[in-house]
Amino acid sequence: MWIDGGIHAREWISPATVTWMLKELVENDAAHPDLTEKMDWYILPIVNPDGYAYSRIEDRNRMWRKTRTPNGIHGCEGTDANRNWGFHWNDGGSSSNSCSETYMGPEVWSEVENTYV
Protein backbone atom coordinates (compact mmCIF):
# COMPACT_ATOMS: atom_id res chain seq x y z
CA MET A 1 0.00 0.00 0.00
CA TRP A 2 1.42 3.37 -1.01
CA ILE A 3 0.31 6.53 0.81
CA ASP A 4 1.78 9.97 0.28
CA GLY A 5 0.97 13.54 1.21
CA GLY A 6 2.32 17.01 0.67
CA ILE A 7 2.86 16.75 -3.06
CA HIS A 8 1.46 20.28 -3.41
CA ALA A 9 3.22 22.58 -0.95
CA ARG A 10 0.13 24.47 0.19
CA GLU A 11 -1.93 21.39 1.05
CA TRP A 12 -0.85 21.40 4.69
CA ILE A 13 -3.53 18.98 5.88
CA SER A 14 -2.30 16.03 3.80
CA PRO A 15 0.99 15.43 5.72
CA ALA A 16 -0.93 15.62 8.99
CA THR A 17 -3.51 13.16 7.66
CA VAL A 18 -0.85 10.72 6.47
CA THR A 19 0.92 10.97 9.84
CA TRP A 20 -2.38 10.33 11.65
CA MET A 21 -3.04 7.26 9.47
CA LEU A 22 0.42 5.90 10.31
CA LYS A 23 -0.19 6.47 14.03
CA GLU A 24 -3.51 4.62 13.82
CA LEU A 25 -1.93 1.68 12.01
CA VAL A 26 0.85 1.38 14.59
CA GLU A 27 -1.28 1.89 17.69
CA ASN A 28 -4.19 -0.29 16.54
CA ASP A 29 -2.44 -3.00 14.56
CA ALA A 30 -4.06 -5.78 16.61
CA ALA A 31 -7.51 -4.52 15.66
CA HIS A 32 -6.76 -4.83 11.94
CA PRO A 33 -4.34 -7.73 11.38
CA ASP A 34 -5.55 -8.05 7.80
CA LEU A 35 -4.10 -4.61 7.12
CA THR A 36 -0.90 -4.80 9.11
CA GLU A 37 0.15 -8.42 8.64
CA LYS A 38 -0.88 -9.12 5.06
CA MET A 39 0.20 -5.91 3.37
CA ASP A 40 3.44 -4.01 2.90
CA TRP A 41 3.05 -0.31 3.66
CA TYR A 42 5.08 2.50 2.09
CA ILE A 43 4.27 5.87 3.63
CA LEU A 44 5.73 9.24 2.69
CA PRO A 45 4.12 12.10 4.64
CA ILE A 46 5.70 14.93 2.59
CA VAL A 47 6.68 14.42 -1.05
CA ASN A 48 7.60 18.10 -1.57
CA PRO A 49 9.45 19.16 1.62
CA ASP A 50 11.10 22.29 0.18
CA GLY A 51 7.84 23.65 -1.19
CA TYR A 52 6.01 22.73 2.01
CA ALA A 53 8.57 24.57 4.16
CA TYR A 54 8.53 27.59 1.84
CA SER A 55 4.73 27.83 2.03
CA ARG A 56 4.96 28.06 5.81
CA ILE A 57 7.73 30.69 6.13
CA GLU A 58 5.70 33.83 5.44
CA ASP A 59 2.02 34.58 4.85
CA ARG A 60 2.78 35.76 1.32
CA ASN A 61 4.04 32.24 0.46
CA ARG A 62 0.99 30.48 1.91
CA MET A 63 -0.53 29.51 -1.45
CA TRP A 64 2.74 28.25 -3.00
CA ARG A 65 2.02 24.97 -4.78
CA LYS A 66 5.14 23.89 -6.66
CA THR A 67 8.60 22.60 -5.79
CA ARG A 68 11.39 25.16 -5.36
CA THR A 69 13.60 24.18 -8.31
CA PRO A 70 15.06 27.24 -10.09
CA ASN A 71 13.70 27.59 -13.64
CA GLY A 72 15.77 30.56 -14.77
CA ILE A 73 12.99 33.12 -14.28
CA HIS A 74 12.84 34.94 -10.94
CA GLY A 75 9.45 34.41 -9.32
CA CYS A 76 8.64 31.39 -11.47
CA GLU A 77 10.59 28.80 -9.50
CA GLY A 78 9.36 25.27 -9.20
CA THR A 79 7.44 22.56 -10.96
CA ASP A 80 4.09 21.04 -10.11
CA ALA A 81 5.36 17.70 -8.84
CA ASN A 82 1.98 16.11 -9.53
CA ARG A 83 2.44 16.95 -13.23
CA ASN A 84 6.02 15.65 -13.48
CA TRP A 85 5.44 11.89 -13.42
CA GLY A 86 6.29 9.68 -16.39
CA PHE A 87 2.68 8.56 -16.88
CA HIS A 88 0.78 10.81 -19.32
CA TRP A 89 3.35 13.60 -18.99
CA ASN A 90 2.37 16.58 -21.16
CA ASP A 91 -0.98 14.93 -21.85
CA GLY A 92 -3.34 17.72 -20.78
CA GLY A 93 -4.06 19.36 -17.44
CA SER A 94 -0.55 20.80 -17.25
CA SER A 95 1.36 23.75 -18.65
CA SER A 96 4.71 24.21 -20.37
CA ASN A 97 4.85 27.79 -19.00
CA SER A 98 7.26 27.79 -16.05
CA CYS A 99 5.28 30.60 -14.39
CA SER A 100 2.10 28.50 -14.33
CA GLU A 101 1.03 26.72 -11.15
CA THR A 102 0.58 23.57 -13.23
CA TYR A 103 4.02 23.75 -14.88
CA MET A 104 4.95 20.17 -15.78
CA GLY A 105 8.70 20.78 -15.74
CA PRO A 106 11.22 20.93 -18.57
CA GLU A 107 11.12 17.16 -18.96
CA VAL A 108 9.53 14.12 -17.40
CA TRP A 109 11.00 13.21 -13.99
CA SER A 110 12.94 16.49 -13.84
CA GLU A 111 12.12 16.96 -10.16
CA VAL A 112 14.25 15.16 -7.61
CA GLU A 113 11.14 14.68 -5.46
CA ASN A 114 9.54 12.63 -8.22
CA THR A 115 12.60 10.55 -9.00
CA TYR A 116 13.04 9.60 -5.34
CA VAL A 117 9.46 8.44 -5.06
Predicted regions and their residues:
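Active-site/substrate-binding loop(s) of hydrolase catalytic cores
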Residues: 2-4, 12-117
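Conserved phosphate/anionic-ligand binding catalytic regions in large, soluble enzymes, centered on
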Residues: 8
